[in-house]
């Protein structure tokens, strides 16, 4: 059963995890956002609710 022979696929799996864990996180974390998020105001809006005529 050739799928049980780990020599062809084990090195590929280890190398791909090496790429994922070593190279990709610094590249992803280096991205910057163009706009910093601002805090929303904590004021409550003074709007009246609209009653629906159910007749």
UniProtKB/Swiss-Prot annotation:
Keywords: ATP synthesis, CF(0), Hydrogen ion transport, Ion transport, Membrane, Mitochondrion, Transmembrane, Transmembrane helix, Transport. Its main location: mitochondrion. It is found in: Mitochondrion membrane. The chain crosses the membrane at residues 9-29. GO terms for molecular function: proton transmembrane transporter activity. InterPro entries: ATP8_metazoa (IPR001421), ATPase_protein_8 (IPR050635). GO terms for biological process: proton motive force-driven ATP synthesis. One of its GO terms (cellular component) is mitochondrial membrane. Pfam families: ATP-synt_8 (PF00895). It is a single-pass membrane protein. Subunit 8, of the mitochondrial membrane ATP synthase complex (F(1)F(0) ATP synthase or Complex V) that produces ATP from ADP in the presence of a proton gradient across the membrane which is generated by electron transport complexes of the respiratory chain. ATP synthase complex consist of a soluble F(1) head domain - the catalytic core - and a membrane F(1) domain - the membrane proton channel. These two domains are linked by a central stalk rotating inside the F(1) region and a stationary peripheral stalk. Belongs to the ATPase protein 8 family. Component of the ATP synthase complex composed at least of ATP5F1A/subunit alpha, ATP5F1B/subunit beta, ATP5MC1/subunit c (homooctomer), MT-ATP6/subunit a, MT-ATP8/subunit 8, ATP5ME/subunit e, ATP5MF/subunit f, ATP5MG/subunit g, ATP5MK/subunit k, ATP5MJ/subunit j, ATP5F1C/subunit gamma, ATP5F1D/subunit delta, ATP5F1E/subunit epsilon, ATP5PF/subunit F6, ATP5PB/subunit b, ATP5PD/subunit d, ATP5PO/subunit OSCP. This is ATP synthase F(0) complex subunit 8. It comes from Tetraodon nigroviridis (Spotted green pufferfish).
């Amino acid at each position: 059963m050739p799928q049980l022979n780990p020599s062809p696929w084990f090195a590929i799996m280890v190398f791909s995890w090496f790429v994922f864990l070593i190279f990709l996180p610094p590249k992803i974390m280096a991205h910057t956002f163009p706009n910093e998020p601002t805090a929303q105001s904590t004021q409550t809006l003074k709007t009246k609710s609209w009653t629906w005529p159910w007749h």
